[in-house]
Amino acid sequence: MSQFSHYNEDGLPKMVDISSKSATSRTATAECRVRISPRLYEAIHEQSLKKGNPLPVAQVAGIMAAKKTAEWIPMCHPILIQGTDLSFKYEPVKDGYMLVIGATVTVDGNTGVEMEALTAVTAAALTFYDMCKAVDKSMVIEETLLVKKTGGKNGDFYHPRREKMD
């Protein structure tokens, strides 16, 4: 008999049956940070990148990835996402800038959207890197985390390293 939720009694992987869970309004917000050089920051703001503005492309990539999360993560349930929104902001840091990518995903369903939010910011960061690598291959994608989640049986979660967001 298996003691793990994602393995059957024969010890093989399985997708958990969520049909008995109640459908509730659920939201998840994730964040990913990309450290960039002053040179890249200037190129973006001067609109001199050969591939064009990386942010709209990264935004679309994040939305598309959120919708495809179940195809990327084996035990993730395919769900009908009701909304995905991404945000981008630059913060000055020592030796450059930090691009902070945020994603909020919403659903009325019987499973959460944490993985969808995390997948959205990760795909957006990878797309940003792809759009900008001709100028700066030394970018660092770092600190991907779940900022908050609301709804569901276990209630709300707020990452202890981020302020409570309302």
From Swiss-Prot:
Its EC number is 4.6.1.17. Pathway: Cofactor biosynthesis; molybdopterin biosynthesis. SUPFAM superfamilies: Molybdenum cofactor biosynthesis protein C, MoaC (SSF55040). Catalyzes the conversion of (8S)-3',8-cyclo-7,8-dihydroguanosine 5'-triphosphate to cyclic pyranopterin monophosphate (cPMP). The keyword Lyase applies. Substrate binds at residues 75-77, 115-116. The gene is moaC. It holds the Pfam family MoaC. InterPro entries: MoaC, MoaC_bact/euk, MoaC_sf, MoCo_biosynth_MoaA/MoaC, Mopterin_CF_biosynth-C_dom. PANTHER family: MOLYBDOPTERIN COFACTOR SYNTHESIS PROTEIN A (PTHR22960). Gene3D superfamilies: Molybdopterin cofactor biosynthesis C (MoaC) domain. It comes from Shouchella clausii (strain KSM-K16) (Alkalihalobacillus clausii). GO terms for molecular function: cyclic pyranopterin monophosphate synthase activity. It comes from the Bacteria. Transmembrane segments: none annotated. This is Cyclic pyranopterin monophosphate synthase. The active site is at 130. It catalyses: (8S)-3',8-cyclo-7,8-dihydroguanosine 5'-triphosphate = cyclic pyranopterin phosphate + diphosphate.
